[in-house]
Structures are given as structure tokens and as C-alpha cells.
């Protein structure tokens, strides 16, 4: 079991901004995950992996694949208070779910 957070590298966000957006993605997706998966994930150490994509199009392609696979997810849209315009999609939280299920979609992405 793991959770994957995907960050858009094309936005050139600062480290603090990336951390905040990744946290929003993690919590948002966690809240949409079934209880039995959450318990299993917690028992296995709550593994999280943060990766990046180069564009909004790439992120949305993964988002569609995750939805089609029935994996819990959360698309983060920034509030626009600091570095980027309001409504900008910054991150995607995926899972927690089975490693193999998530890896079929995100396994080729680069670690952040």
C-alpha cells in the first residue's frame, strides 16, 4: 500500500509552496479513501512517494487513468494567495491503494 503525490514541475513553485500543495493532495486523497484501505496502509507504515510531471496535460492524463482505475484521488487547485494564480491545478494525490495498482499508472514518473 502506498500513496503517490504528483507535483507539476512546470509551475516552478518554491520548496515551501510544493510542500504545502503536496500536503493538500495527500490529505484530500486520504479523506476519499475507503476505511479498510486506510487501515491497511497505516499498518504498513503509511508510505508516500512524491513524483513530478512536466505539464498540466500530463497531470490530467494521469488523473483520468486514476479515475478510470477506481483509485481514490484529489486534484489540488491553488487558492492564489501567493505564487500562482487562483484555480491553477498544482498537484494530484493518489490513494492510498495497492502498490501494483498505482504503479501501473505512475511507475515511470521521476521522483521529485
From Swiss-Prot:
Reaction catalyzed: an N-acyl-L-alpha-aminoacyl-tRNA + H2O = an N-acyl-L-amino acid + a tRNA + H(+)
Entry EC number(s): 3.1.1.29
Assigned keywords, A-Z: Cytoplasm, Hydrolase
Entry's transmembrane regions: none
Major location (coarse): cytoplasm
Localization annotation: Cytoplasm
GO MF annotation list: peptidyl-tRNA hydrolase activity
InterPro entries xref list: Pep_tRNA_hydro_II_dom_sf, Pept_tRNA_hydro_arch, PTH2
GO biological process: translation
CDD domains, per the entry: PTH2 (cd02430)
Gene3D superfamilies with a match to the protein in the record: Bit1 (3.40.1490.10)
GO (cellular component) term, any one: cytosol
Keyword Hydrolase: yes
Enzyme class, spelled out: hydrolase
Its job: The natural substrate for this enzyme may be peptidyl-tRNAs which drop off the ribosome during protein synthesis.
PANTHER family per UniProt: PEPTIDYL-TRNA HYDROLASE 2, PEPTIDYL-TRNA HYDROLASE 2, MITOCHONDRIAL
Similarity comment: family membership: Belongs to the PTH2 family.
Protein name: Peptidyl-tRNA hydrolase
Organism: Methanothermobacter thermautotrophicus (strain ATCC 29096 / DSM 1053 / JCM 10044 / NBRC 100330 / Delta H) (Methanobacterium thermoautotrophicum)
Lineage: Archaea, Methanobacteriati, Methanobacteriota, Methanomada group, Methanobacteria
Amino acid at each position: 500500500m502506498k500513496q503517490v503525490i504528483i507535483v507539476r514541475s512546470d509551475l516552478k513553485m518554491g520548496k515551501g509552496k510544493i510542500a504545502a500543495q503536496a500536503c493538500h493532495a495527500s490529505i484530500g486523497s486520504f479523506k476519499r479513501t475507503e476505511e479498510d484501505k486506510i487501515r491497511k496502509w497505516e499498518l504498513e507504515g503509511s508510505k508516500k512517494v512524491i513524483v513530478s510531471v512536466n505539464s498540466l496535460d500530463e497531470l490530467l492524463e494521469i488523473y483520468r487513468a486514476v479515475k478510470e482505475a477506481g483509485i481514490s484521488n484529489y486534484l489540488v487547485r491553488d487558492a492564489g494567495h501567493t505564487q500562482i494564480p487562483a484555480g491553477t491545478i498544482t498537484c494530484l494525490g493518489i490513494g492510498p491503494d495497492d502498490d501494483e495498482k498505482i504503479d501501473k499508472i505512475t511507475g515511470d514518473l521521476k521522483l521529485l
